[in-house]
Amino acid sequence: GDELWGGAGADTYIYKQTYQSDPGSNDAILDFNYSEDRIDISAITSGASVSRTLTNGTLFKLDTDNNGTYEMQWDLEGYTGTADQVTVVT
């Protein structure tokens, strides 16, 4: 996976395919701020709801088709919020 820095201000991390940050090669977002930043997977989900979880404090996972398997995940380095506080554009 890639290491991403958004810098100061609001950032949107856009993904168009699940393999771009799948559990085998997930990206690390090194400065994710839940009050400003968001993850956009609308090209994958087309508005459908997703299931989310946060494990080990910083590993954020999404089930993009609600089949019980997490297809995408990110390491949100230094993240201190909850899974529900991560803004995901679907």
Predicted feature locations:
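Acidic, glycine-rich calcium-binding repeat modules characteristic of RTX/beta-roll
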Residues: 1-48
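Low-complexity acidic/polar repeat-biased segments
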Residues: 47-90
